[in-house]
């Protein structure tokens, strides 16, 4: 049986080659017949035409059968019987020797230190080290001392021998606490060289974190000393400050009078100012008449007041304010405050005349254009 099946498997590719060649030949014959039929009748052949010719019908059937056999996969390999072959067994947990080492020396069973209770993972972990030395020797070599803040290749100077650690004397935000902070931090080898010289640090303390150096008692003493100086020497009070304050007050009064007059004048001149602005934006050809502003007479007039008396009064007021006394107003000041300046009121017009709404119409005539161009040129 085995011999017959093996011959079938050998002849299978030959049969496939023969069937494919015969199928190609049949296909060529069928195509030639179809072209001849199309030339003769002017159309492709149909099923009825194929059935009439028995030879052509046989070729069609044979071609269909060969095509079907070529598409179906041969099931020859399924019936092939194979004799069983003994597989190679790999026992990964085998610990018996003799085992060749990297240096070429053979280690027998009695020289190896094998424990029967170890698992496969522990065997892989014990491979580290030289094959000749035992595990006890390796453990002795690994018991060397390691400093936590240094590498085995670099020696680190002892900071505790040179610098004495003291208690923190300053607050948490004090710039004087930088030295104490540097002593308390544990440094790594990367930043160790930066903190070796703590005294010559390139950073300056921040001025924003400083607290007031003087206490409240010291500030109170200084205030009392300054107060005694003013009481003992009242003439030393600078007259320059009194003159400056007096002039500032006088200028403020004049400025307020000017503002009040300007508010009264703006009520009647709002339409004129708006009209002037409108002329500027639209760019009309009419010339806007800009009259000079009226000079304020009050600004040139000198106030009818005694400057020396006012200076003396201001000096007394400033001195009393420094001492914390209440300032008593004089009669002249109260009279000036009680009699404010009388404001002039504008009389309202009785009727709204139609002539107020009159506006000249500028027609773009030829003469007007010439005039406008001449006027623009003179300007």
UniProtKB/Swiss-Prot annotation:
Gene3D superfamilies xrefs: 1.10.10.1460
Ranges of biased composition (kind: Basic residues): 368-379
Compartment annotation: Cytoplasm; Nucleus
GO cellular component entries: cytoplasm; DNA replication preinitiation complex
InterPro entries: DNA_rep_checkpnt_protein, Sld2
Listed Pfam families: Drc1-Sld2
Biological process annotations from GO: DNA replication initiation; double-strand break repair via break-induced replication; mitotic DNA replication preinitiation complex assembly
Keyword list, A-Z: Cell cycle, Cytoplasm, DNA replication, Nucleus
Main location: cytoplasm
GO terms for MF: DNA replication origin binding; single-stranded DNA binding
Domain of life the protein comes from: Eukaryota
Span list, region Disordered: 287-306, 324-379
Family: Belongs to the SLD2 family.
Role noted for this protein: Has a role in the initiation of DNA replication. Required at S-phase checkpoint.
Name this protein carries in UniProt: DNA replication regulator SLD2
